[in-house]
């Protein structure tokens, strides 16, 4: 990862007497030795945000683009979708739905192609019925598009990738 390489480079150029702290997933980690960096990065394989402080000065605050579809549910909806500054695509699906399984690889491809430009989430309607009801989801798969916390568009059914790509391009 690019952030990991940058952090290792900074760590090797900084004296061990310096206070080096990185924060990920809301947890702070103080690096006090060269061996500690190896342990820390084993834990960082899936980090999406990093804040680096040296001697109490913020040196780096970076986010990596998430290039895979993440799960959203009733409890995380407001934070991940409504609170997002990046446009959002949400796939409403259920495990028993054949067309949902057909469209899933297309959503995965879009997440990779548009990493950093759009966030892609999937919401299991069986596990999160409140959000599905709130947005009037009556057929699945349904893909909703949000920008600045507002619902902008929807696509119902298993559609070709080109249809979804066109919608994504409209909102990025």
Curated annotation (Swiss-Prot):
Record's GO cellular component terms: chloroplast
Positions annotated as active site in the UniProt record: 97, 100
GO terms of molecular function: enzyme activator activity; protein-disulfide reductase activity
Keyword Transcription on entry: no
Site positions for Contributes to redox potential value: 98-99
Family of this protein: Belongs to the thioredoxin family. Plant M-type subfamily.
Protein name, per record: Thioredoxin M-type, chloroplastic
Residues marked Deprotonates C-terminal active site Cys (site): 91
Organism: Pisum sativum (Garden pea)
PANTHER family tied to this protein: GEO12009P1, THIOREDOXIN M5, CHLOROPLASTIC
Domain Thioredoxin span(s) in chain numbering: 61-172
Keyword flag Electron transport: yes
Disulfide bridge map: 97-100
Assigned keywords, A-Z: Chloroplast, Disulfide bond, Electron transport, Plastid, Redox-active center, Transit peptide, Transport
Places the protein is found: Plastid, Chloroplast
A family per Pfam: Thioredoxin
Cited function: Participates in various redox reactions through the reversible oxidation of the active center dithiol to a disulfide. The M form is known to activate NADP-malate dehydrogenase.
Transit peptide region: 1-60
Assembly and binders: Forms a complex with heterodimeric ferredoxin-thioredoxin reductase (FTR) and ferredoxin.
């Amino acid at each position: 990862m690019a952030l990991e390489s940058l952090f290792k480079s900074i760590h090797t150029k900084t004296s061990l007497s310096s206070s080096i702290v990185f924060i990920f997933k809301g947890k702070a980690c103080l690096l006090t030795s060269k061996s500690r960096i190896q342990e820390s990065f084993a834990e960082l394989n899936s980090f999406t945000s990093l804040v680096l402080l040296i001697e109490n000065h913020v040196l780096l605050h970076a986010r990596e683009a998430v290039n895979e579809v993440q799960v959203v549910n009733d409890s995380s909806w407001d934070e991940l979708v409504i609170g997002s500054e990046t446009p959002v695509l949400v796939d409403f699906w259920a495990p028993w739905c054949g067309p949902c399984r057909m469209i899933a690889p297309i959503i995965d491809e879009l997440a990779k192609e548009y990493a950093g430009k759009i966030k892609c989430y999937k919401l299991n309607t069986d596990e999160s019925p409140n959000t599905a009801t709130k947005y009037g989801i009556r057929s699945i798969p349904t893909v909703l598009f949000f920008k600045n916390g507002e619902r902008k568009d929807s696509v119902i059914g298993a559609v070709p990738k080109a249809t979804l790509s066109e919608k994504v391009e409209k909102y990025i």
